[in-house]
Amino acid sequence: MASSISEQINHLRSTLEQHSYNYYVLDTPSIPDAEYDRLLQQLSALETQHPELITADSPTQKVGGAALSKFEQVAHQVPMLSLDNAFSEDEFIAFNRRIKERLMSTEELTFCCEPKLDGLAVSIIYRDGVLVQAATRGDGLTGENVTQNVKTIRNVPLKLRGSDYPAELEVRGEVFMDNAGFEKFNIEAEKRGEKVFVNPRNAAAGSLRQLDSKITAKRPLMFYAYSTGLVADGSIAEDHYQQLEKLTDWGLPLCPETKLVEGPQAALAYYTDILTRRGELKYEIDGVVIKINQKALQERLGFVARAPRWAIAYKFPAQEEITKLLDVEFQVGRTGAITPVARLEPVFVGGVTVSNATLHNGDEIARLGVKVGDTVIIRRAGDVIPQITQVVLERRPDDARDIEFPVTCPICDSHVEKVEGEAVARCTGGLVCPAQRKQAIKHFASRKALDIDGLGDKIVDQLVDRELIKTPADLFILKQGHFESLERMGPKSAKNLVTALQDAKATTLAKFLYSLGIREAGEATTQNLANHFLTLENVINASIDSLTQVSDVGEIVATHVRSFFAEQHNLDVVNALVEQGINWPELTPPSAQEQPLAGLVYVLTGTLNTLNRNDAKARLQQLGAKVSGSVSAKTDALVAGEKAGSKLTKAQDLGIDVLTEEDLINLLEQHNG
């Protein structure tokens, strides 16, 4: 009997999985929805009677599980990179040209094109064909574990079809809510008196990030796969489109508009076609993604910053509306940048209500010729940032008034300075300016800086507004009573904050330098400064020439660092912080044995086949070398990989030593790097 029940259950599962595959992957439903539901109910009833036969990959397990208290963090083994954007045909043509120049090829490229879905990127890991983990993109390196929620999405297979899949397979794609599902969901939510969402993307995000997966299971979420991440035993196909076809064979849904095209003109035609049919599609999109199809070419092109060179998101023109400019206010940022902000009559555009827009700077105001009282065209650039793009001059009222850019800071009345060659005007008040003061202290306390637990933005705002602090150093003279006087701060929270401030005094030189908020000096830069100069005094006294000797520090960053420490009020704050007990472990200069390449300048060019470019750079730096991005008379050696171009020619002209990748590997092994 048990065998018969087991056979019934297995038969129902395979039948339901086949119908799901027909419906979601092949887009050819083979039975009515009611019949599918009836079969699912039969399976559920049998599993309820025989719980020992329930498996994790059963279609009935898409109903959700126990609620979570919070999402755990998941590190992506292969980073989930973002894409560079193109907003015009010229920008896409430039992208195509850059690729061909880098490949040194005149042949037309094959592109894989697909709509850019307006949802959330997720990673789904299958182990031995079974879904074991799902995570959001997060910051690209770390995301949130949403496994239980993704399991409830109806077109996500809990078990892959077939048997030829890798032992471990990471599938990447987009979770979204189609237009019909979104409309139905909002209507039902409104009837129940619950929150309605302004657009499908917000609805998808809110649904996927539910701590209770049973709630997610009731939401009409969908998933389309678009790539892979980690794959056991290497790639599953020689080109991207073949890879997608393999995914569909294994039961994963693919956007039906995905298409292979030859050459840039065909890619542009695809873009135009999708843009024309945008309103007819069943889901929201904000552009198309265009990728080089051949995996070998993708590997040769590699990555820049946090985006691949071989793909681009060609965004659609933002949706536009007409509204009225009511006023312009000037905001002051942490670095003193003066930014004009347009206050608008609220208008619904691109899925949200917009009442503010950036005017960027004085040059943009002059270019637009805009006045207060004008009727303007507003758009959301890239469907994100509201912008004024045009003035409707025929509607200009008689009482329209010019926008006067301030000559003094609207916050502290200090002089406003506009450096030649820069579009941004800045307040010269530094840490005297309350606007900069708040942002400077928030930056100082942030996680990547001194990481002062409990010192949130609202507390900083209150401390500055009440004039309890004027500089970061003032934080360390505050007593528990000062914090207890703030809104929503009880004795326990105040005591914890005092303790956190004391704990934060023990830091590193790199974090301390980062906490000062020097323009364009990020985490990597301040770490390199600390490693190079070893002491705060050395950094303070460093000349621009000596600063540019630091790895990854160019003349612009060096100038910002030098200018910061040339200002006495900045030095006063630094000295006060040290006097308050900020400290870090003493750094000792590495020995000649530890850094045998100290003082030497290397340049990497071309494709490295054995070493990862970033790994090679890091290993050279560990041995004391400076790795530069350009060849000059100061370069000691050039490492030339395959397809080395103009840098190799210049190095040969200058008589600079040229190393092969094999030479570099031998050099690193010689010095145990």
From Swiss-Prot:
GO terms for biological process: DNA repair; DNA replication. Its EC number is 6.5.1.2. The active site is at K116 (n6-amp-lysine intermediate). It catalyses: NAD(+) + (deoxyribonucleotide)n-3'-hydroxyl + 5'-phospho-(deoxyribonucleotide)m = (deoxyribonucleotide)n+m + AMP + beta-nicotinamide D-nucleotide. Transmembrane segments: none annotated. Keywords: DNA damage, DNA repair, DNA replication, Ligase, Magnesium, Manganese, Metal-binding, NAD, Zinc. Its cofactor is Mg(2+); Mn(2+). GO terms for molecular function: DNA ligase (NAD+) activity; metal ion binding. Residues 592-673 form the BRCT domain. Signal peptide: none annotated. Belongs to the NAD-dependent DNA ligase family. LigA subfamily. HAMAP family: DNA_ligase_A (MF_01588). This is DNA ligase.
